[in-house]
């Protein structure tokens, strides 16, 4: 039986411990999580050369000023583009190397292609990782793929509207947990429930007893 209690071991840092000086989803943000013992939540994309990198948006413009879609680049191309003209967008391998099992990692897969290449490349990395991790996605295709090919992995579905609620009912037997938008809490389901994203102390007090754990930023 899967042990998913690590998802409740501490609060979850949304895209790492970032602030005005340290951007989200960067190595310094993840180093801080390791130091403070927070669970890391991060986002991943696959590039044209099958490198897997840690970044939230599909377009780079917001954090880098470069108006390019991240999935259209190779890693050598992406590595020349900096966040705040200073920080390199890290690969998942780099992040896992510095974390090295010291804290759990919650990985959101940003896959909209539904062709399985992303998942196949990802498990080449995760199969050899000794630390605790879980996978989550808004895309039901991702849930299906992992249920078929890696049933031992801990898998969650991200819920953000009524459409996803209907999907949950269809996929409840295939998932180990759900990540629910805070305004949909409490969410009645016989699974571990994470709430996202908590950005104020008042929200923390309001939602902390309505789910099993919270994904937070600004308040950690």
Could you say what each language-model-derived stretch is?
Residues 1-220:
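Phosphate-group recognition and catalysis centered on beta-loop-alpha active-site segments
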């Amino acid at each position: 039986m899967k042990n998913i209690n690590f998802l409740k071991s501490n609060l979850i840092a949304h895209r790492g411990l970032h602030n005005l000086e340290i951007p989200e989803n960067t190595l310094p943000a993840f180093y801080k999580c390791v130091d403070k013992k927070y669970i890391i939540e991060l986002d991943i994309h696959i590039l044209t050369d099958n490198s897997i990198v840690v970044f939230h948006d599909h377009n780079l413009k917001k954090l880098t000023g470069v108006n390019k879609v991240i999935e259209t680049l190779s890693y050598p191309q992406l590595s020349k583009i900096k966040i705040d003209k200073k920080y390199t967008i890290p690969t998942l391998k780099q992040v896992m190397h510095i974390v090295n099992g010291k804290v759990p990692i919650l990985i959101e897969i940003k896959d909209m292609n539904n062709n399985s290449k992303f998942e196949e490349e990802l498990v080449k990395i995760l199969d050899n990782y000794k630390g605790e991790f879980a996978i989550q996605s808004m895309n039901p295709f991702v849930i299906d793929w992992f249920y078929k090919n890696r049933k031992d992995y801990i898998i969650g579905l991200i819920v953000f509207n009524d459409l996803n609620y209907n999907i949950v009912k269809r996929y409840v037997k295939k998932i180990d947990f759900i990540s629910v938008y805070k305004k949909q809490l409490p969410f009645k389901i016989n699974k571990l429930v994470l709430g996202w994203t908590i950005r104020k102390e008042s929200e923390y007090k309001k939602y902390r007893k309505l789910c099993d754990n919270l994904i937070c930023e600004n308040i950690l």
